[in-house]
């Protein structure tokens, strides 16, 4: 049985053994460990994950791929090393899901690029979080997440995307992946991205003050980046009273002319702790 990639599902099937090895190496997988794979497609990555001795839960939206995988991995399914689920991961409530995601777990996947943001939000901002991720994403997205220092200044420029990841874990750019590593090849370069040590411990002080502190945090961050040319403080006046900001800026000793892109993840956490 053979299936062809569906453009509507953003499918690009991995065909590179070298990239596969890079993903498995970055995953640092232990035998018996729980792995969640999203969009297994033809099962190339699934097979490599199973060879490590890991227990894999693979969630596939495409019924054609699901049937192919069910046949291809019949033995692993029977031995319960692989649990194959037909469904849309973005619609699954991981806490009450019928496939009962075992924890702790790692998320390792070649995801459709158009849902990268939604995947990061779902698995970083909500329980149960993976302890780490290894994802194939667009290179441009990986660059933005890691926000590596600019050659001219030696400083990195943060974005909503990079902050959204770094407050939960540590991202690493593992490797650039050319279009030819996929069938069909995408029109852009890709990258293997890992996010290590995922947790919400950075939000401890914020959550102690407000159980919905993570939502409030991102409300503040989004406001801070609302107008790129404006100063951070001016942007925040959209959602916080000027008098409150004046007091917080004074107490924290912040530069009046600082911009959102120059604020580090810890700066944001400290700011919201003072505001909440």
Tell me what each language-model feature is.
Residues 1-219, 243, 261, 271:
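Catalytic cores of RNA-modifying enzymes
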Residues 197, 223-276:
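C-terminal lobe and adjacent flexible extensions of AdoMet/dcAdoMet transferase-like proteins
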């Amino acid at each position: 049985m053979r299936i062809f990639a569906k453009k509507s599902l953003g499918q690009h099937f991995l065909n590179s053994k070298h990239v596969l090895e890079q993903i498995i190496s970055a995953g640092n997988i232990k035998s018996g460990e729980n792995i969640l794979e999203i969009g297994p497609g033809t099962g190339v990555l699934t097979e490599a994950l199973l060879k490590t001795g890991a227990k894999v839960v693979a969630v596939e939206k495409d019924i054609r791929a699901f049937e192919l995988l069910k046949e291809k991995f019949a033995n692993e399914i029977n031995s319960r090393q692989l649990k194959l689920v037909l469904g849309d991961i973005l619609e699954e409530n991981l806490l009450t899901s019928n496939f009962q995601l075992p924890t702790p777990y790692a998320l390792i996947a070649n995801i459709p690029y158009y849902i990268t943001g939604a995947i990061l939000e779902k698995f970083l901002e909500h329980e149960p979080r993976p302890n780490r991720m290894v994802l194939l994403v667009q290179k441009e997205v990986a660059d933005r997440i890691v926000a590596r220092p600019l050659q001219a200044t030696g400083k990195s420029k943060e974005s909503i995307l990079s902050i959204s990841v770094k407050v939960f874990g540590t991202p690493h750019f593992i490797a650039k992946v050319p279009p030819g590593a996929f069938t069909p090849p995408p029109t852009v370069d890709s990258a293997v991205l890992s996010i290590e040590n995922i947790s919400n411990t950075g939000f401890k002080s914020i959550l102690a003050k407000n159980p919905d502190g993570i939502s409030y945090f991102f409300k503040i961050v989004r406001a801070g980046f609302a107008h790129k040319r404006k100063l951070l403080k001016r942007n925040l006046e959209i959602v916080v009273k000027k008098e409150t900001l004046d007091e917080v800026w004074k107490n924290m000793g912040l530069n009046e002319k600082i911009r959102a892109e120059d604020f580090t993840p810890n700066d944001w956490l400290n700011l919201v702790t003072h505001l909440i």
